[in-house]
């Protein structure tokens, strides 16, 4: 939607509204009643929406983070490896990294404890390319370094066990 000055609004689909969005994404009255905001420091063209994500499948983005997406009108504009907010008939709103296949799209979580899965292109209702995000959780690089160090130590332990068996 556009404000009285002709500036593009960004509608927010929060977790509460996300359940109704799958059925009302094209309902002007539903969209009109969503919370709206503008970001003067983001200069963009096109239609944008903000989605509050839930779950831990896209860590380090945490549940409650807001992803701003630009509407993508055609599958030809999708780029492998980029992240998108996708509205599907089956799963509703999902936020994933993608790989475009012939008749389907592979959805890939950044959190590797979740397996990738494919959806048919015919199941896709809307696609929004992620262009920015806001989070209430600030990154803690110390935790990331500890995580990497633990993985490396585990690999060394596994190598030592293999050497001892040989």
Regions picked out by a protein language model, each given a short descriptive name:
Residues 23-24, 39-108, 113:
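Feature for secretory/organellar precursors and membrane-associated catalytic proteins
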Residues 1-63, 134-166:
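Short, positionally conserved secondary-structure boundary motifs
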Residues 77-81, 85-166:
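C-terminal regulatory/effector modules of DNA-binding transcriptional regulators
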């Amino acid at each position: 939607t556009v404000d009285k000055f002709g500036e593009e609004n960004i509608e927010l689909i929060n977790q509460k509204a996300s359940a109704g969005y799958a059925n009302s994404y094209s309902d002007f009255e539903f969209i009109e009643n969503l919370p709206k905001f503008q970001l003067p420091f983001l200069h963009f063209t096109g239609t944008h929406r903000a989605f509050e994500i839930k779950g831990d499948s896209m860590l380090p983005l945490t549940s409650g983070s807001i992803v701003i997406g630009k509407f993508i009108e055609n599958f030809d504009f999708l780029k492998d490896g980029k992240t998108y907010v996708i509205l599907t008939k089956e799963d509703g709103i999902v936020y994933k990294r993608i790989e475009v296949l012939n008749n389907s799209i592979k959805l890939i979580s950044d959190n590797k404890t979740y397996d990738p899965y494919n959806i048919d292109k015919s199941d896709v209702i809307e696609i929004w390319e992620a262009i920015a995000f806001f989070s209430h959780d600030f990154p803690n690089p110390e935790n990331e370094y500890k995580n990497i160090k633990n993985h490396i130590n585990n690999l060394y332990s596994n190598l030592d066990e293999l050497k001892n068996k040989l």
